[in-house]
């Protein structure tokens, strides 16, 4: 598997092609913004109809990353579900699939703005996780260091094509959204530009993760 290795606060990390973050020394795999159940929520709220396959596609990619890394610890970095009702409304196949992935693992759900509070589906539920020298939370805090977050679904454009990306500088890493149908925020948006140092990189996801200077 091609990865992009980098260091944050002295911790050796790697971005996987899928957008997952792998911390081999801790056996920790981190994914952000799965947004499971998005098509169901859209249908429930009489919004645009989306093909009802995004949960299966997301879980299939997550299963592949778990198998590739053998991760004993999984951190879901918030907005794992599109809303609380989506967590309760997974169909039996998806619920069973998720249960198989969680079995025998230290599974940690970080609260997001779409899914605050305990979800009642097992695992550990936290507002943030401190695993020195890193802190994992859903939304970046200005001035924080050694921080891994998500929320913004960052994307960057290269050769006319926009792709999900990891944003990283000496203080923080902002993960791309892992889920299907998640959209994204351009890296030159003021919300992201204000968080990242001027020498930040955008690492484009894909079969061969590719670092470029963060577009501003």
Task: Please name every model-derived segment.
Residues 1-76, 80-216:
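Extended recognition/assembly regions associated with phosphoester-bond processing machinery
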């Amino acid at each position: 598997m091609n990865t992009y290795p980098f260091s944050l606060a002295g911790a050796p990390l790697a971005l996987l092609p899928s957008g997952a973050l792998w911390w081999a020394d801790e056996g920790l795999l981190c994914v952000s913004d799965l947004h499971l159940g998005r098509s169901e929520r859209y249908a429930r709220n009489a919004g645009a109809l989306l093909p009802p396959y995004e949960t299966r596609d997301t879980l299939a990619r997550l299963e592949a990353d778990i198998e590739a890394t053998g991760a004993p610890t999984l951190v879901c970095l918030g907005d794992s579900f599109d809303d609380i009702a989506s967590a309760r409304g997974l169909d039996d196949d998806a619920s069973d699939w998720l249960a198989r992935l969680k079995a025998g693992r230290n599974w940690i759900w970080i609260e997001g703005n779409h899914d605050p509070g305990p979800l009642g589906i097992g695992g550990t539920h936290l507002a943030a996780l401190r695993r020195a020298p890193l802190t994992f939370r859903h939304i970046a805090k200005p001035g924080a260091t050694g921080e891994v977050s998500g929320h913004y679904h960052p994307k960057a454009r290269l050769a006319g094509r926009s792709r999900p990306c990891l944003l990283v500088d000496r203080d923080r890493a902002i993960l791309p959204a892992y889920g299907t149908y998640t959209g994204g925020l351009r890296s030159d948006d003021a919300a992201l530009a204000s968080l990242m140092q001027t020498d930040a990189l955008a690492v484009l996801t894909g079969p061969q993760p590719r670092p470029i200077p963060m577009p501003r």
